[in-house]
Amino acid sequence: MLAFTLRFIKNKRYLATLAGALVIIAGLTSQHAWSGNGLPQINGKALAALAKQHPVVVLFRHAERCDRSDNTCLSDSTGITVNGAQDARALGKAFSADIQNYNLYSSNTVRTIQSATWFSAGRSLTVDKKMMDCGSGIYASINTLLKKSQNKNIVIFTHNHCLTYIAKNKRGVKFDPDYLDALVMHAENGKLFLDGEFVPG
């Protein structure tokens, strides 16, 4: 009987400990959403809060490619589709609701230039061919843009292999971005840090 009582007490303590741990985990999950790829999700409000502390860098993959879709092309066959342009415009409106002040850059391809143009709805765009080359040198290129922008927030339209490289290099995760997916970085003391994946909303 005594042995049974001790086992019962131990089980109750174990269950109480387990329940407490689950409550803590649930609390953490409610405060920090995570993507299935292991990257933290950063919505517009979180991005705006981060931008108050440091210059942020948001790197978008371009919109839907015309040459890999049956949808209607916007114009040039090497550019984006009409649907892609409309998606970029809608995304830009949502983004600007939280981040109004930023400088805009893109690589030197038609699809990234069109994506950036529709995203920004007329904002001045600077084309930089270095945003096409994505290896270890990408960070120096981004820091150069930050200096040109006088450490303002910057938005860059680039390519999936760039985002994949950064996610793997900075956080060791596999990131296979869809059209208009984005990564969020911030600059601090001359260094770039990957904060997570941008999720509109």
Swiss-Prot record:
Q: Carries keyword Signal?
A: yes
Q: Biological process GO terms, please? A: lipopolysaccharide metabolic process
Q: Which class of enzymes does this protein belong to?
A: hydrolase
Keyword list (alphabetical) reads:
Hydrolase, Periplasm, Signal
**Chief subcellular site?**
periplasm
Keyword Cell inner membrane included in the entry's annotation: no
Pathway given in the UniProt record:
Bacterial outer membrane biogenesis; lipopolysaccharide metabolism
Tell me which SUPFAM superfamilies the record gives: Phosphoglycerate mutase-like (SSF53254)
Signal sequence, start to end: 1-35
Q: Name one GO molecular function term.
A: phosphatase activity
Enzyme Commission identifier(s):
3.1.3.-
Localization of this protein: Periplasm
The UniProt entry's coiled-coil ranges are none
An example GO CC term for this entry is:
periplasmic space
Q: What does this protein do?
A: Catalyzes the dephosphorylation of heptose(II) of the outer membrane lipopolysaccharide core.
Q: Which family does it belong to?
A: Belongs to the phosphoglycerate mutase family. Ais subfamily.
Name this protein carries in UniProt? Lipopolysaccharide core heptose(II)-phosphate phosphatase
The record lists the organism as Salmonella schwarzengrund (strain CVM19633)
